[in-house]
Every structure is written in structure tokens, then in C-alpha cells.
Amino acid sequence: MTLIDGKAISEQVKQEIAAEVAEIVAHGGKRPHLAAILVGHDGGSETYVAAKVKACEVCGFKSSLIRYESDVTEDELLAKVRELNEDDDVDGFIVQLPLPKHISEQKVIETIDYRKDVDGFHPINVGRMSIGLPCYVSATPNGILELLKRYRIETSGKKCVVLGRSNIVGKPMAALMMQKAYPGDATVTVCHSRSKDLVKECREADIIIAALGQPNFVKAEMVKEGAVVIDVGTTRVPDASKKSGFKLTGDVKFDEVSPKCSFITPVPGGVGPMTIVSLMKNTLLAGKKAIYQ
């Protein structure tokens, strides 16, 4: 069993990005600038945004954090999004999700200029991705592709089961795993809460990508010998022994599943760090105007 070390790979990729940024700046180019909008004080969102700001420092990017209280109006937030769309100094920006109930996440996503949508959530980026055109691919699926590549995991002709059908992970992941490229060319099945025989589907899978948000959902009897298991789940489960009062728990029951796997990602330290690195890669592309002029 090989443990896929997302933390180590993410550090490596950040160093590669930093070297490229240093080169750009040395030749008189502009330092890439990522802005983030954070609404309210959700614990998970605070943690993610802090990690993104820190990653920007390591990569040599400029970063801006714009904060609002959770009672900010939708109009106020959309006005800020439009302002960032027009700001030539900002290469890419994200609005950290989830947003408070009174704000339409979809409206916010669609208001972002797709050329600055480094999260890859805008319908134009999603559509381009689904037909294999250059675009900003959403960060978590892109991070998973990077891990498959760096560990040279064979995907062509393999049966891949994606657990979950969210717009952020499940759907794009399925589209990417069946694209005509490496990593891809897999035979993809998407399972979700309404799927029948989910256990049977998983048992036949060469690759399982679990993105349900249900702690310890994937058990040993659902995984065949030699499977590759990618765990996208990060649920905060209360744990009195931890200083924070919780433990990050994946969708896979790691201790019992890992002995059967050829490759598996841990939680934390697997997919999570790669998500942030993918955002950095998209920001670099935005700064270089590599995809959109």
C-alpha cells in the first residue's frame, strides 16, 4: 500500500510555482494577485482562507482578503464582485463558500468574470471543462488529477466510481476521469444517495473517488484488493482529545480500508493541500493570461 502524500506534493508544486513567479518578476513581469472574499465567521471557511493566504506568500503572489459580516446584503456583495471584475491589478479572485442563506451562491458565481474565476465554478469554465477546452478547472478535481499524475497511477480503461454528484467535486471529477487524456480514459460510474447497489459498484471499482461528506462511509467490504482510493471527505467530527475539539474525518474508514489498497489518500494531508495548490496554479495561469486574454 502506498500512501499518497498530498502535503509533500503540494509543497513541491508551490516551490515550482514560486520559481516561475520569481522568473516572471525578474523579467519585469507582474506578480500574480489573488483576492478572496470571506463572509461571516464559519470555522471551516476561516481555516481555508487562512491557508490560501499563506499559500500565496509561499508562491510569491500578492493576496488581498476582503471580509464582510454575515449580514452583508446580496447587492453589496455583488457590487464588490463587479468591482473586482474591473480591477486590473487583481488577476483572479474567489468568494469563499458557503454563503449565508439570504445570498444566492449561484448568482454570485455567475457574476464573477469567468476570466478571473480561479475556483472554476462559473458555468463558462464548467462548460469548457466538460468539452475539453482550456479553462480554469475547479480546484479539488484538478488537485486529484495532479496526485494521479505525480504517482503515475494508471487510469486508462480502469473502472472508476465517483461517490457524490456535487457541482464542486463529483460532476467535474466524473467528466475529467472520462476525458480523452491522462489522467482520464476511465470507465466512470457516478453513485449518490439515490443509487441502488452502491456497494456492488464500489466492489468492482479499480479507482474510488469518495466525495459524499459522510464520515467513514466507505468500509473494507466495499473495496477490492489493489484498488486506488481517493478520499475527498473532510467532516469535522467532535473529538474531546483534540485541542480544537474536533477531528477531520474522511469519507473512507482509513484503518480498515488502507490494507486492501494499492494507493490511498489520508485525511488530513491528502486531497486538501492539493485543492489549495490547484487554486494557486489557476492564479498563475490568470496572471500569465495563459487561458483568457
Curated annotation (Swiss-Prot):
Residues binding NADP(+), per UniProt: G164, R165, S166, S193, T234
InterPro entries cross-referenced by the UniProt entry: Aminoacid_DH-like_N_sf, NAD(P)-bd_dom_sf, THF_DH/CycHdrlase, THF_DH/CycHdrlase_cat_dom, THF_DH/CycHdrlase_CS, THF_DH/CycHdrlase_NAD-bd_dom
Keyword check for Oxidoreductase: yes
SUPFAM superfamilies according to UniProt: Aminoacid dehydrogenase-like, N-terminal domain (SSF53223), NAD(P)-binding Rossmann-fold domains (SSF51735)
GO MF, one example: methenyltetrahydrofolate cyclohydrolase activity
GO biological process: L-histidine biosynthetic process; methionine biosynthetic process; purine nucleotide biosynthetic process; tetrahydrofolate interconversion
Purpose: Catalyzes the oxidation of 5,10-methylenetetrahydrofolate to 5,10-methenyltetrahydrofolate and then the hydrolysis of 5,10-methenyltetrahydrofolate to 10-formyltetrahydrofolate.
Family indicated by similarity: Belongs to the tetrahydrofolate dehydrogenase/cyclohydrolase family.
Subunit structure as annotated in this protein's UniProt entry: Homodimer.
HAMAP family, A to Z: THF_DHG_CYH
The protein, known as: Bifunctional protein FolD
The organism of origin for this protein: Bacteroides fragilis (strain ATCC 25285 / DSM 2151 / CCUG 4856 / JCM 11019 / LMG 10263 / NCTC 9343 / Onslow / VPI 2553 / EN-2)
Gene: folD
